[in-house]
């Protein structure tokens, strides 16, 4: 849309009337006042934005909050001050929440029902589930009168056009991490289907509700509102939907090799209010060649862990083969209780006889590996416990006991890299974290991953060299020789300036009643390498992040707040005269 200033003035908000300001202009509407508006109106009473504003202007809320002048100026197509403009955008977000909250919730249900998990041996862009979600997003975009492009089934792009040349990229992703269905059980015994949104209380359980199909949905509906209300924009918005964010990470580079990079980039895949720093993502993958068991006693034949390197599961299960299962189960149960008591008592170890085998289960608390402090890692505890049995319960030595010794000697239950001696911290970004996560075994090898989250303060090459040197010393001492693969990415640290970032900070902190300051994250997103890249929600930093966990959920209140915030943000950023 190529609006002239005359047309802009006649349409709705007048871009020409806004002057650049060096301090953020606030919307004179508190979180409590917004809540009062939400309780006064409902979706059935809201037809369009102008009708909504007219009704708000006549309400007691407007009189109390002095909103009438802003609404009157807007409806009369008059020049708005920066503060008035921001009040109108705040009301736009509230309108979107009231008008489309129920529809957006239903769309989230539909997207979660598509299991967009990586399939072994199938490229993501050929996976039928991704073709299905691409068609669904295309259908939604077109029904919202938005432009849709499918870039070779790798990235889905939805565009909202403005009048200028600048482009703001809004980033979300359609892929999700794998699930272990048997772990999706609530404390009261309720079993959940990971790919069906289940509403219990205010929690919407389902894989992708938090990470990151919610981001796709709220961005689409925010675009819809701005489009159908014909609000003029000084720049374009592109919703860039990644398909490999949780795995190879090759879809976004593929996209930008063929398409221009937006000047500004916001990831709806992290934390509020505005995150300007992301730790670097790293992996220490140890591969233990399968070997014939040696010695006497029981043999551990299998062990489970996370299904992805960035996932701390709620349970780890090991299978023991023995001639005396009842006696072994009893001994493991007693040893497990003692071990749990010595190590915090915040996890459980259970041994049960299954035919001729014994199944050992360590139950902890699932977490995203970027926040190991929010969980209790059962993988680390399983391996450390197995290693602690040496000399107490007879076990044959094989590749799994080798891995247990490696884990116990080098990583232990500590997730700060202290045991290996590689820990360090940055005052703003926080400490390095190192979490035992992924476990896999085939007929050739047993694999065990440690997921690293690395702050600024030490170069990736230096850190890799430190880790490699210490692990090499351990292999010489232990005579256990796994193959190690190390990777460490640079952390992201930005010092953004300009009206755009002031606006982002104001929108998030005012709506969420948060401190007006930038944040940092241990999670890496699609904007890690992109210009002017920041995270803009959609999780609150003081609330446990449930993405990647068993029993992932998003609260209905926060989901609707996200819709409100993202709509307000797009209206406000879209109409700033200068970013």
Where are these regions (language model features)?
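Acidic/histidine-rich catalytic neighborhood of metal-dependent amide-processing enzymes
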Residues: 212-291, 333, 414-427
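Acidic-enriched catalytic cores of C-N bond-cleaving enzymes acting on peptides and small amides
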Residues: 276-304, 309-362, 369-433, 437, ...
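Gram-negative bacterial Sec-dependent N-terminal signal peptides
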Residues: 1-27
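Alpha-helical metal-binding/catalytic segments enriched in His/Glu/Asp
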Residues: 170, 198-247, 284-292, 316-327, ...
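C-terminal catalytic subdomain
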Residues: 441-464
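Acidic/His- and Gly-rich active-site-bordering loop/insert found
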Residues: 28-205, 233
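Zn-dependent metallopeptidase/amidohydrolase metal-coordination segment
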Residues: 28-42, 361, 442-444, 453, ...
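A short beta-alpha structural unit
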Residues: 401-408, 437, 451-456, 481-501, ...
């Amino acid at each position: 849309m190529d609006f002239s200033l005359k047309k802009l003035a006649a349409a709705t908000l007048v871009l020409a009337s806004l002057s650049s300001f060096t301090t953020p202009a606030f919307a004179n509407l508190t979180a409590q006042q917004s809540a009062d508006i939400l309780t006064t109106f409902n979706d059935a009473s809201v037809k369009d934005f102008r009708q909504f504003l007219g009704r708000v202007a006549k309400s007691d809320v407007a009189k109390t909050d002095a909103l009438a002048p802003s609404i009157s100026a807007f409806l009369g197509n008059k020049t708005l001050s920066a503060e008035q403009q921001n009040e109108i955008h705040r009301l736009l977000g509230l309108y979107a929440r009231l008008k489309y909250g129920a529809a957006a919730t239903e769309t989230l249900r539909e997207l979660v029902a598509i299991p967009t998990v990586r399939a072994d041996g199938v490229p993501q862009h050929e996976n039928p589930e991704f073709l299905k979600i691409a068609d669904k997003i295309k259908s939604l975009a077109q029904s919202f009168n938005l432009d849709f492009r499918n870039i070779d089934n790798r990235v889905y792009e939805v565009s909202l056009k403005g009048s200028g040349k600048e482009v703001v990229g809004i980033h979300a992703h359609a892929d999700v991490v794998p699930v272990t269905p048997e772990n999706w059980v609530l404390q009261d015994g309720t079993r959940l289907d990971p790919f069906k949104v289940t509403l219990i209380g205010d929690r919407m359980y389902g894989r992708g509700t938090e990470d990151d199909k919610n981001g796709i949905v709220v961005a689409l509906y925010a675009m819809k509102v701005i489009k159908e209300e014909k609000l003029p924009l000084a720049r374009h918005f592109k919703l860039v939907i990644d398909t490999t964010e949780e795995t190879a990470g090759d879809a976004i580079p593929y996209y930008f090799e063929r398409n221009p990079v937006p000047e500004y980039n916001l990831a709806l895949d992290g934390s509020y209010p505005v995150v300007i720093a992301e730790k670097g993502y790293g992996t220490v993958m140890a591969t233990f060649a399968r070997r014939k068991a040696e010695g006497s006693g029981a043999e551990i034949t299998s062990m489970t862990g996370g299904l992805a390197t960035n996932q701390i599961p709620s349970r780890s299960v090991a299978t023991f083969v023995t001639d005396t299962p009842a006696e072994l189960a009893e001994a493991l149960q007693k040893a497990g209780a003692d071990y749990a008591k010595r190590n915090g008592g915040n996890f459980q170890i259970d041994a049960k006889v299954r035919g001729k085998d014994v199944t050992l289960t360590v139950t902890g608390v699932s977490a995203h590996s970027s926040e190991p402090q929010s969980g209790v890692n059962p993988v680390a505890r399983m391996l450390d416990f197995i290693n602690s049995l040496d000399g107490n319960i007879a076990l044959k030595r094989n590749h799994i006991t080798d891995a247990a010794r490696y884990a116990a000697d080098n990583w232990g239950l500590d997730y700060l890299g202290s045991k290996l001696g590689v820990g360090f911290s940055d005052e703003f970004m926080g400490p390095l974290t190192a979490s035992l996560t992924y476990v896999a075994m085939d007929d050739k090898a047993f694999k065990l991953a440690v997921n690293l989250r690395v702050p600024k303060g030490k170069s990736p090459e230096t850190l890799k060299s430190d880790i490699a040197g210490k692990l090499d010393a351990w292999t010489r001492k232990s005579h256990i020789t796994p193959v190690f693969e190390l990777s460490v990415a640079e952390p992201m640290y930005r010092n953004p300036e300009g009206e755009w970032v002031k606006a982002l900070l104001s929108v998030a902190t005012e709506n969420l009643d948060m401190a007006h300051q930038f944040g940092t994250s241990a999670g890496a997103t699609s904007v890690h390498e992109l210009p002017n890249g920041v995270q803009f929600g959609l999780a609150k930093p003081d609330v446990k992040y449930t993405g990647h966990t068993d029993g992932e959920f998003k609260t209905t209140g926060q989901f609707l707040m996200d819709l409100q915030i993202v709509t307000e943000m797009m209206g406000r950023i879209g109409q700033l005269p200068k970013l």
